[in-house]
Every structure is written in C-alpha cells, then in structure tokens.
Regions:
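N-terminal helix-turn-helix DNA-binding core of bacterial DNA-binding proteins
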Residues: 3-5, 9-11, 15-37
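Alpha-helical residues within the helix-turn-helix
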Residues: 33, 50-51
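Key DNA-contact positions within bacterial/archaeal DNA-binding proteins
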Residues: 40
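Short, hydrophobic-biased segments on the C-terminal half of alpha helices
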Residues: 46-47
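Beta-hairpin "wing" of winged helix-turn-helix
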Residues: 53-62, 66-67
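Conserved segment of winged-helix/HTH DNA-binding domains
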Residues: 71-96, 108, 114-117
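C-terminal regulatory/oligomerization modules of transcriptional regulators
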Residues: 94-142
Length: 142
C-alpha cells in the first residue's frame, strides 16, 4: 500500500478545513496557499471530496469549501478510502478483487489480512478533531 499524493493532499485539505470556522466557506486560493498545493490540482481533489459528500462547495463571492460534518465524524480511513479506494497491502485483499484460487492454502494471506486490519483500525481511530490537540513528541526507546 502506497498512499498517493492525491490521498496525502486530501488529508491535508480536510485537516485544514477542520481548523476553519465551520459556518464559513474557505476559498480555494487560501487553502492552496496554506497547503502549498497548486490551485488546479487542489480543485480536482476538492471536487472529489464534494462528490463523496465530505465537503460542501459554494461558488461566487463569499464562496469556497467547508466540511459537511463536525471534525469528530471524519476518520483518516474514511478520507483515504474516498480518495484512494482500497488501502490493502496486497491485491487479493483489495475491494472487489476476484477470489484467489490459492486463498485457502496461501501461507501468507493471514499476515496480509492482519496487516490490513491493523491499518484500518489505526487509521479509523484517528479523526480530524485529533489534529486540534497539542502534539506530544514521541520518545523512542533503544
């Protein structure tokens, strides 16, 4: 599993919007400047997020984008699924993948299934609201 630039940018945009006034629309130009993403590329990502119902877009004066729900209701997993589709580490576990003829006897399949579950659980446990909390440095023990 490699998360694409599109997926990473979508996360950044959603975090950015979650930190704005929930009643106001944030112009594309402002988001692009803060996130250092080209307006053209960002527009494609925003269109996808509007289509998925994650954000609302309003054209014209006073227009822009805003979240459709509160930050607590968005998980990183849901945002990545909207932009990436499957987050599976191997093709046989992707959404709508044909059943592998070796699935019943594959010695590594349980490993990939567990990894898939760990990724889903971890990304599903983090919401946009979590980015509003102070960051605590992580100590790595040797």
């Amino acid at each position: 599993m490699i998360i694409s630039t599109r997926g990473r940018y979508a996360l950044r945009v959603m975090i950015d919007l979650s930190q704005q006034d929930p009643e106001s629309y944030t112009p594309l130009k402002e988001i692009a400047a803060r996130q250092e993403i080209s307006e053209k590329y960002l527009e494609n990502i925003l269109k996808a997020l509007v289509t998925q119902g994650f954000i609302l877009g309003l054209r014209g004066k006073g227009g822009g984008y805003r979240l459709t729900k509160s930050p607590e209701e968005y998980t990183l997993a849901s945002i990545l699924h909207a932009t990436e589709g499957s987050l599976a580490a191997v093709a046989c576990l992707e959404d709508h993948a044909p059943e592998c003829a070796r699935a019943g006897q594959c010695p590594t399949r349980p490993i990939w299934e567990k990894l898939d579950n760990l990724i889903e659980d971890y990304l599903g446990s983090i919401t946009l609201a979590d980015f509003h909390k102070p960051i605590i440095p992580c100590k790595i023990e040797k």
